[in-house]
């Protein structure tokens, strides 16, 4: 299957004929990038999770796999105001003037085919059998924001 989610290891793995893309859900429900590159057959790729030994003195979390600093971790969907000082993928401001956003993994869906993105450029497939889609649902419990991250794997690239 082009997209798998290992619930036990909490790893998403997306395969095309030539490439693999993988990310991991931490014990604190943050999404961390694991790998993108040449296709790999392994299903257990948590050994690729990079946990630095020497964390800088910045806010960090400890989720049982060692502490990780948001400023050093390869966050899959970086947001602003949560100790990651790199460029965020989005910025918002709520009605109270707060701009912090922290997205936590909530659930996912894997299905054949691809939803249309109205008004946006997108890849396409001739039939639903040529593409598998992954939707990762994230929530920010502080401001009620719900985010859907969409991924797809095309069989013929």
Regions found by a protein language model. Give the residues of each.
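Short, Gly/Pro- and small/polar-rich lid/capping loops
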Residues: 1-10
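Hydrophobic/aromatic beta-strand elements that line small-molecule binding cavities or substrate pockets
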Residues: 149-151
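Short, surface-exposed, low-complexity cationic segments
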Residues: 26-44
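Conserved, mostly hydrophobic/aromatic
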Residues: 18
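Conserved small/polar residues in nucleotide/adenosyl-binding loops
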Residues: 155-157
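An extended acidic
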Residues: 49-144
